[in-house]
């Protein structure tokens, strides 16, 4: 792969510069990056709505809320723990990731749904999405929930993963 070769070239170039052999540095290979997912991996709005509908019909409200939160806010799966009971009051979550703070706005419809969800689930403090030990859900549980609902909704599992819901948010 060109990107792997470029990594080696960068390492060699750094060594050459450290040794003051600047004339030995070589150019990296130009790589054309694709801006979008291949169409066969792109989740459509229709498929997303089917996932949510099936989750609700299966009485799997946690998965339905999870889908709507990931798609409605564009957050990363690792940032889900910052969606907590306190932030539902103001509709804003401060996410600390990669050394930065980002302010996530919760759409009012999602905010209302999440408030109802935490009330029905008797979640008083902490993360909205908790495991059975009242700890924030980890990425493995999120993935398994999404794959399970994809099978029930007859949506290709190749298309259903947390980051693809982030892309859906960016496209809509």
Describe the residue ranges of each PLM region.
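Conserved catalytic core of the tyrosine transesterase superfamily
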Residues: 1-172
